[in-house]
Structures are given as structure tokens and as C-alpha cells.
């Protein structure tokens, strides 16, 4: 079974959030009055594995495990192993803040994890504390170093924020020049009730222009391996690359191939939409089997919207959707 929407996009990528908990409090991810999902509402690992099994049967070939911070959930390493053992054919990726996992890197390598996306918005310790509310920069840098030493490919994701990390672009480029990483900037997307979005927005085009004033950035031709949303640039004389992801200024809705399932079992077909489809109650109803889940997933996929239409309708002080990013799963 192949998942296809009403405008002909094939969906083959699932982002599965295993928790909304995180050991950081990033300014763009949660607000002071943020409330966690109650524990009984969080999917059990066996329920998540059932969803992965279903996804694989529906031609999902790429799976990304996210949070919150996925490694903050007890038993996550065992869950990774179960997924890898059950579906060695799936391209498994993990997104993490990198603060908890330096000691786990050898085991991650052993069980077959070959790549990680690590969130890092700044290389400055004081700015890190300002952005995340915690003092863990050295832990993240140690994790990146350990991954590279172990042969795990690393993509570093930084949310581009004017007035926060725009002054560090040259430092980030140097970081990528010195290390074999993809250093990717993602345009800031206001979520939930964020009202500071316009003042923080730093466009991908502005980043590229600023970066080219510092170093020669050479466009990387798109290939089957490089078919994601990032525009990639090699750095002259460098080991790594610079990437730009522009969901706001230059959307990639026409080629979007992904679904999201939150840690409480809500299926979301578009990051810019608040429409959800409940899977948890079906999972926990003994009278409903996998066919009921397939039906919901297939019908939701058919109605997958073109998100930029929704983005165009928002006012400058509104988030792209009403839900906090930590609840959706970045």
C-alpha cells in the first residue's frame, strides 16, 4: 500500500515523537505555562512499535524519532533496538539535543545507528543558557565529537534567530569547516502563542548573503541522497557543509512527503495545521484492529493540505499553529 494525497504527493516519511518531555526549556519550543501531556495519555513503546509496523506496511521507508528529548524517556535505547531489529530496511534517524548521550554513543553505534540530528542554536555558553535555560553547551559539543569519532554522521540544526545567534554565523561556518558535519540553519517558525516571531525572523536568503561575505559557499547539486528540504552548500577548504531550510520564506510544501505522530498518538499531516487524527483510542480498543488504523492514516493522508496556504492566512502575531513544538515533535 502506497500513501498518496489528493494532489499526488507520495508520503513515505514518518516523524514519531516518543515524548513531550525535555531537559531543556528552549525559548521557541515551550512557554512558561506549558503543560505536559499526562503520562497515561503517552503511547507505550509497544503501541509505538505497532505504529512503526503499520507504517512499514504502508510504504514508509524513512522514520525519524523525536521528542521533546527522546533520550530523556526511560527505555528509549531498547526501543531503538526493537525498531532496528524489526525493520532493518527502514532508514532510521533520530533528533536529539545531544545533552544526555555522550556515554551512549558506543552503544548507539553498536545497535546500528548511523546518523543523528543534533540541535544546537549557539556556540556561545551564555547564549546557550539564554536560549535553553540550562548550561549544557559542553555536553552537546562532547556528544558531537564522540559521534564523529565513532563514525556516526552528524547534522547540526540551529534555529535561525535574529538578535540571538545571527552574530555567530561566521563561528558556525568555521565549526563546519573544521568538522565533517552538515551545519543547517532552519528559519524560525512561531508556534503556539509566540508573539515575538517577526522580530526574530532571519531568512535563509539573508543567511546565505551574510555567509558569502565571509567564505565561498558552493551550491551542492541535489541527488537521491540529498533530496531533503535543505539547500546545501560546500564550504571552500572545509570538511563540512552549510545547509539552509526555509519553511517560511520559501516553503517546500509541493514536495512534502511526511506525516507526524505525537507522543500521545495524534496524527498530524502538516506542521502548519492544527488538524489531528486520533490513533491512541484505536490502538487501545481491543475490538479494533490494524485495518482501522490503516483507514484513518490513509484517509488523513489524502486530505494532507498545502501548508503554505495556511501560513498565508495567519497574522504576523500568530504562530504557524496553536500547538507548542515540544508537543508536536520537532
UniProtKB/Swiss-Prot annotation:
Pathway: Cofactor biosynthesis; molybdopterin biosynthesis. S-adenosyl-L-methionine binds at residues 28, 68, 119, 189. Keywords: 4Fe-4S, GTP-binding, Iron, Iron-sulfur, Lyase, Metal-binding, Molybdenum cofactor biosynthesis, Nucleotide-binding, S-adenosyl-L-methionine. It is an enzyme of class 4 (lyase). Binds 2 [4Fe-4S] clusters. Binds 1 [4Fe-4S] cluster coordinated with 3 cysteines and an exchangeable S-adenosyl-L-methionine and 1 [4Fe-4S] cluster coordinated with 3 cysteines and the GTP-derived substrate. GO terms for biological process: Mo-molybdopterin cofactor biosynthetic process. Pfam families: Fer4_12, Mob_synth_C, Radical_SAM. It catalyses: GTP + AH2 + S-adenosyl-L-methionine = (8S)-3',8-cyclo-7,8-dihydroguanosine 5'-triphosphate + 5'-deoxyadenosine + L-methionine + A + H(+). One of its GO terms (molecular function) is cyclic pyranopterin monophosphate synthase activity. Catalyzes the cyclization of GTP to (8S)-3',8-cyclo-7,8-dihydroguanosine 5'-triphosphate. HAMAP family: MoaA_B. This is GTP 3',8-cyclase. It comes from Maridesulfovibrio salexigens (strain ATCC 14822 / DSM 2638 / NCIMB 8403 / VKM B-1763) (Desulfovibrio salexigens). The gene is moaA.
